[in-house]
Regions:
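Polybasic/polar functional segments that serve as interface/processing modules
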Residues: 1-100
Length: 100
């Protein structure tokens, strides 16, 4: 649902449920991928939203997941990756939402 709301083009979805709990999964999208790993016993989830191009709205996906998990603390960091590494442009990583 997060990928759909973010306007991603979904190619494939693969999830694995661990015993006794927890999941790992990836949503492959035409623009790259979204992945998640959860540790319910620690009330923790790690989510990556990777995108190339300017169609995907990662902030929409992130907001949806924060709401669905009823997260009490979040840390969201936007990172520049990929082709910028070979250019003269400086790479700027910034916290989008500080840990709260």
């Amino acid at each position: 649902e997060a990928a759909r709301l973010a306007q991603a083009t979904i190619v494939d979805i693969v999830f694995h449920e661990f015993n006794p709990f927890g999941i790992s999964g990836v949503v492959v999208i035409a623009e790259s991928h979204l992945s998640i790993h959860t540790w319910p016993e620690y009330r923790y989830a790690a989510v990556d939203i990777f995108s190339c191009g300017d169609v995907l709205q990662p902030e929409v996906a992130a907001s949806y997941l924060v709401e669905q998990f009823a997260a009490e603390r979040t840390s969201i960091v936007e990172m520049q990756r990929g082709m910028f590494l070979n250019s003269s442009m400086p790479i700027v990583n910034r916290a989008v939402v500080a840990i709260r």
